[in-house]
Amino acid sequence: MQKVTFKEETYQLEGKALKVGDKAPDVKLVNGDLQEVNLLKQGVRFQVVSALPSLTGSVCLLQAKHFNEQTGKLPSVSFSVISMDLPFSQGQICGAEGIKDLRILSDFRYKAFGENYGVLLGKGSLQGLLARSVFVLDDKGVVIYKEIVQNILEEPNYEALLKVLK
């Protein structure tokens, strides 16, 4: 099992770990209107799925802002950001921070994303939240890039991700 750290704590990731080449599971998530939606989108060249513990964290907010900026530069790419935050909180934070071009989704109801993508934090003070991670799916829903950030307090490797999308 893969492990990540937050300050002095080490967490085992729970769920089924996906690897590059796997077909990504289509899971149910909750949007800002409290409606259930499927994760996988049709008709896009690439889908970037970015998970983070909570939009209330400063590094998490930087991650969301970075992907929000990329939406206009990469029109053939769909960007989704997923956390365990309640959709109301997600909407308030994104509205206050000008994050409006991302698909913001919550895994709070079923934890299906965390469990099916292997990024659910195990025992510790952040138990039940999502590990900071990024998946890129191709137009057939196959994982072509995966990064699980080892230290939750660090941002993903944006340069490596952008190379995959070009």
From Swiss-Prot:
UniProt xrefs under SUPFAM superfamilies: Thioredoxin-like
GO MF entries: thioredoxin peroxidase activity
InterPro entries per record: Redoxin, Thioredoxin-like_sf, Thioredoxin_domain, TPX, Tpx_CS, Tpx_Peroxidase_subfamily
Top-level taxonomic group: Bacteria
Stretches assigned to the Thioredoxin domain: 18-166
Sorted UniProt keywords: Antioxidant, Disulfide bond, Oxidoreductase, Peroxidase, Redox-active center
Keyword Transmembrane carried by entry: no
PROSITE patterns: THIOREDOXIN_2 (PS51352), TPX (PS01265)
EC number: 1.11.1.24
A Pfam family reported for this protein in Swiss-Prot or TrEMBL: Redoxin
Active-site residues, record numbering mapped to chain: C60 (cysteine sulfenic acid (-soh) intermediate)
Catalytic activity as recorded in UniProt: a hydroperoxide + [thioredoxin]-dithiol = an alcohol + [thioredoxin]-disulfide + H2O
Cysteines engaged in disulfide bonds, as pairs: C60-C94
UniProt subunit comment: Homodimer.
Task of the protein: Thiol-specific peroxidase that catalyzes the reduction of hydrogen peroxide and organic hydroperoxides to water and alcohols, respectively. Plays a role in cell protection against oxidative stress by detoxifying peroxides.
Similarity annotation: Belongs to the peroxiredoxin family. Tpx subfamily.
Other facts noted in the record for this chain: The active site is a conserved redox-active cysteine residue, the peroxidatic cysteine (C(P)), which makes the nucleophilic attack on the peroxide substrate. The peroxide oxidizes the C(P)-SH to cysteine sulfenic acid (C(P)-SOH), which then reacts with another cysteine residue, the resolving cysteine (C(R)), to form a disulfide bridge. The disulfide is subsequently reduced by an appropriate electron donor to complete the catalytic cycle. In this atypical 2-Cys peroxiredoxin, C(R) is present in the same subunit to form an intramolecular disulfide.
HAMAP family xref list: Tpx (MF_00269)
Protein's UniProt name: Thiol peroxidase
Gene field: tpx
